[in-house]
Swiss-Prot record:
The keyword Nucleus applies. It comes from Schizosaccharomyces pombe (strain 972 / ATCC 24843) (Fission yeast). Keywords: Cytoplasm, mRNA processing, Nucleus, Repeat. It is found in: Nucleus; Cytoplasm. HAT repeats lie at residues 85-117, 119-150, 158-193, 204-237, 269-302, 312-344, 523-557. Component of the cleavage factor IA (CFIA) complex, which is involved in the endonucleolytic cleavage during polyadenylation-dependent pre-mRNA 3'-end formation. Residues 27-45 have a biased composition (Polar residues). This is mRNA 3'-end-processing protein rna14.
Amino acid sequence: MNSDDNVEADASSNIIKDSPKIKEQENTSTVNESDVLATSTTASSGVKRKRLPNDLVGQLRDKIQENPNDISSWYALVEEYGSKGKHEELRETYEQMLRPFPYVPRVWVDYISSELAFNDFHAVELLFSRCLVKVLSVDLWTLYLSYIRRINPDGEGQSRSTITQAYEFVINTIGVDILSGPIWSEFVDFLRSGPANSTWEQQQKLDHVRRIYQRAITTPIHNIEKLWRDYDAFENSVNRATARKFVAEKSPVYMAARAAMRELSNLTEGLRVYDFTFERKYTKVERIAYSRWMNWIKWEQSDPLDLQHGTMLQNRIAYAFEQAMLYVPLCPQIWLDGFSYFLSISDEQRALQTIRRGMRYCPSNFVLHVRYAEHEEANNRTSEIRSTYESLIAALAREISQLDSKASSSSESSTDGNPQEKKLPEHLVKRKSRLVRQYSLAWCCLINAIRRTEGVKAARAIFTKARKAPYQSHEIYIASAMMEHHCSRDPVIASRIFELGMRHFGDVPAYVYKYLSYLIAINDETNARALFEKAIPRIAADEAKPIYQKWLDYESNYGDLNAAIALSQRMAVVYPQESTQAIFLSRYGLKDDAEEEERETKEAEKIRELSVRLNGGNGFPGHVHNNREDDEVSIASTSSKSNVEMEDTRLLPASLELANTQGASNPPTSALPTVPVPLPSIITEFLDELPAPQVITGPRIQPTKLIDHIIKSDIPFIRLRNANAHLKRARFN
């Protein structure tokens, strides 16, 4: 058992020792979290044997061995043993089932219920000690309360005290859950039903009931409205004179909790299901589910109950994280955010437990492992750094191997009799490419970590091991070469490593570009020129352009002019779509003026089109009347149609209004130059306050259609005094 398992076991022991009737046993077995992703439920992995048609148990075990995460096969096996009353086989099956599912509430509830059915209370208490504080599920904790009440009759004084302690234990742990309402109600009913043999005992009882009521009505739970009515009736039954005072004091927090309950109910409705607990599906529905879980956590972090960053707020946020970890444990973001949150509240122990648990559920997740390793290294704890990276590398290699196996099986399933190329669907090809890159980056991270903690010599040994690995990309060679250059200050070794990588990645543009840049940086012109001439024929022209440009820049700035001209002519042949002038200008970091002018012309045309629409169809700004009052702008018009057009622009600044007061003295539209009209300051200020376009996820609005609709709409004209000031005031109110 590793360190965080010991910590969790100790915490479980302390709480359960304080809870009634459950004593922690020294030899109690705890959940072995290293078996979370067990690859098999049997020790042997021999050839699959043929089963008889009536051998249902054997068939189910074969299915489980093929896919340990097949929860339906597990439950079919449980049902088979349960229907035949085979207690030991049933118990063994549940224990095997807990290896891949150590935190699934349903499994623990069913396992404990089966032991209760056989009246094995000792086994039940051991199971509760293993799971209770690790699995924060209302169903599991309700079962715990039922067990406590079952073994403690209400009539005895000590039993009542034990049950009271159990209820306090439960509501302190999961009382923030919106589904915990029935537990609060049961606790209140239990307290109110208790005997009181003296005035002092009666007062103690009333105070206890009041305290639980007041906690319940400030918690967003489903039955909060009923509890509020019950609390009101309770206070009035005790003392009408003080009832109004108590109720008035709690009314504001109750209203806030009720509003929060409604929001939380919408957020969590249908959320806690097992559809995404056992296997990643990489579907849109799964992404939506993950997003909903994140929305719940963000909602709790927004502090809707105005708890002011206290312990209660931290408990609520932590509980939301715990629920997400139970139901969507294969979502890496949950573990990363949980780790960051617990660190932010200075709870490093819980943060480490969270990220270690996440690494077991997501063994091939790059970010989780690197984040953990860097945290440990930053805190001078280096014992687990190497093993963390090595486990990540092994997990990524397994995933890549599984994808290769899929490709092999698809090629073998060819029906035309011809050997078929190993081929994966496009989305799996992309996934494999991403995994291979992460695999290489994991080696790079390990090399750097070992160099920092053990020295360059140890890092070289890691590189030697990495370049012999079955899956690799060019990043490994780049990382090792640059380490030698910067840390050993030996460009010769770095160049040798780069050259070694050329054997495998000489046709990879990114690798050649990096190698060429390095040779230029160390002023090795001879080898740089040789590399360029050797690599260019092996790379497709469309991918080689950055390499051409890099060498052209070097020749233009530091080489021979004739060589630069010759290379420019060579590029003109390779890239006929590029103009000779554009290639020439690129030597000086400039762009083709013709292309720039074309772009600027298009932008100016767009501005002119906008100004035409803003001016009601006329392509020029008219004469401006500068009257003292903003709303006393007189506009001479010769037709009712022009009056309507003027009304459409009435609230714009005068610089955009068409003034036609001079009648025939004004030149015709075609006689005036069409120039871009600057937007009014009030509009530019408004545009500055709008969010960036990339954050808008809703339907897009077509601006031109919107302007057309506004222009064509029959909007009644309202003359306002100081219209500009009115508009500004309306925006800020």
